[in-house]
A protein has these predicted regions:
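Bacterial Sec-dependent N-terminal signal peptides
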Residues: 1-27
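Residue-level recognition of tetratricopeptide repeat
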Residues: 45-46, 80, 113, 147
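Structural signature of tandem alpha-helical TPR/SEL1-like repeats
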Residues: 49-62, 82-96, 118-130, 152-153
Length: 153
């Protein structure tokens, strides 16, 4: 009888120790309010470049801008997504991106491209002149500026 009780007790302990437990479900990540725009921006980047979902990326960028209207990278990427599909909207977003950081040469370059696509050559000449001053080592600025002067006559 003792042997049976001991065997039963050991079996219960063994089964209890190695029994399969239900996995814990991880809660959704909590994002601080100060990082909400950045979080939505990174979600948009993931959707655009990993999942190739440009519509979802655009929606994430727009939500990022709603969360933080001074977050320049979201304006920049939104303009980049729209540059060849909706040039007027891309120009508005590129102007916003440039206003958030007037020292960023990538924002300035995108603004110049958007101005060219919207046939605003005089504005593009001013933009590329400034870009030439900011990034004097970039030969493309000189080439585009020469083409713009040729276009204007």
């Amino acid at each position: 009888m003792r042997k049976t009780l001991l065997l039963l007790l050991l079996t219960a302990v063994f089964c209890g120790a190695f029994a399969r437990k239900t996995p814990q479900v991880a809660p959704a990540p909590q994002v601080p309010d100060s990082l909400r725009g950045f979080y939505l921006f990174t979600e948009g980047i993931k959707q655009a470049f990993i999942e190739r979902e440009t519509a979802a990326a655009r929606a994430s960028m727009e939500r990022s801008i709603q969360a933080d209207s001074t977050y320049g990278p979201a304006w920049y990427e939104l303009a980049e997504l729209l540059l060849y599909n909706d040039a007027p909207a891309a120009l508005r977003h590129a102007e916003h991106a440039f206003r958030t950081d007037t020292t960023d040469k990538w924002y300035l370059l995108q603004l110049g491209q958007a101005q060219i696509l919207n046939d605003r050559y005089r504005d593009a000449i001013r933009t590329y002149n400034r870009l030439r001053e900011v990034d004097a080592q970039n030969p493309d600025s000189y080439r585009v500026l020469a083409m713009l002067y040729d276009q204007e006559g």
